[in-house]
Amino acid sequence: LQFAHFSDLHYAPDNLAESDRCFGFAVSNAIDRGAAVGVISGDSTDHRLDAHAPSLNALATQVHRLSNAMPVLMLQGTFSHEPPGTLDNFALMGGTHQIFVADRVSQVALIDGRFWASTGPVFSNDELRQFIDVQPEVVFTCLPTVNKGQLAASVGALEAGTGLGDVLAAFLAAAGRVNRQLRASGIRTVGVSHGTVNGCTTEHGVVMAGFDHEFSLTALFEAECDAFMLGHIHKEQQWERDGRLVAYPGSIGRFHYGEEGDKGYLTWDVEPGSATATLVATPSRQMICVDFDGPPDMARLEEIAATAGDKFVRVRWQIDEEHRQVVDREAIKAMFSGAADLKVEARILPVVRSRAQGISLETTVEGKLARWCDLASVDAAPLQERLQLLALGAEAIAAGVLERLNAQAHSPSLAVVLPHPAATAPAGESEGAVADHPAGTSAPATLDWLNDDLFAA
């Protein structure tokens, strides 16, 4: 029996184009492949939608189109995405076939195209006797999102935080006892749920490991389902054990930057004791993510922009606070004007200045200054002298400056300290030198090489 498994459609005004293009393609493809049953495993909407919202109308149109070709089971997803009651109206939108909304923990049998739900969490022995001889096409074990508030009210807040997995594992084990009977009778068994498997990988490549996740693989396989169809994680992944399969189809489209892998839906072939699943890719958005450790490389961005076309582009960089103005955002926007969308993100690194080690241990300003000079390899004497000036008044500082200027004015000139060689010449040489001068002219008083023009005629 062939199943079409969709999940995480996330219809909303912002996602409408992506969601409807991808889900519309998936519905058409599933119908063309001849799928017998459709399963939507949660998060059909991204948040609360008004009745007149175009995104809700588009979702209803596609689900109705799917129900004209096959029975459809819709599971309650995350409450923040699908507020309780959101899916109730979809049960009234069936076409040729029925749409069943699984919003409580239960088992559901599909008999001649009609869904029959258990009274309690699992089928009782009396209920099994009523239909087991009829040979249902499939029996679903439905485990929608659990309200942790209700769980906390019954078992306590502390236990609800880490004990949710144990509570769900107990239910899956109970369902497994029923599913073993069904498999022994040749009836297909399929689990449908919405949550996180411990150890799975998100669409951004992060491994989900912790104590507060809903499921473990051991608990899921203990449900004894031939196929277990999951939702919530946006990355397609599968786990197999003894021919039985647990799988996420991932989100129907690409809603965030940095998501890894193809987007699509799973087409399942399920028989008692075995199952296979194949991803059918949808025409999701093409996104380009460019990250720089420093300022963006404009030459590289030009190369990327040349092939960006109608893609969605995100450019991120990090830069220190003092150089944030060197990045021309407008130039980057102009480069990618032909792209479908551009998102620029700058991470500004604050300038961090570390204090001198041990400076806080000094009790005086003089000591702190000496400590800083020691660490910075700076001569401390001039700085200490100027620090002492701060204790004086402005008039005292000005008087000290004037006193130094006056002392410099009375210092002997360089000509006196270093007399010209002619002053120490012998007497004869001095007289000859005077006779050489023509009459009526006078020799310069001194040949001071610091003051006279040496190149005068």
Stretch-by-stretch model annotation:
Residues 12-14, 46-49, 75-87, 108-111, ...:
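Active-site environment of divalent metal-dependent phosphoester hydrolases
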Residues 1-4:
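Extreme N-terminal starter segment of soluble prokaryotic enzymes
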Residues 15-112, 124, 217, 221-225:
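Core catalytic region of metal-dependent phosphoesterases/phosphodiesterases
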Residues 85, 89-213, 424, 432:
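Conserved catalytic scaffold of divalent metal-dependent phosphoesterases
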Residues 270-457:
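Accessory, non-catalytic peripheral segments of nucleic-acid enzymes
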Residues 8, 23, 43, 59, ...:
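Divalent metal-coordination and catalytic microenvironments
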Residues 92-97, 197-272:
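Conserved beta-sheet core of the metallophosphoesterase superfamily
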Residues 106-137, 244-316:
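Binuclear metal-dependent phosphoesterase catalytic core
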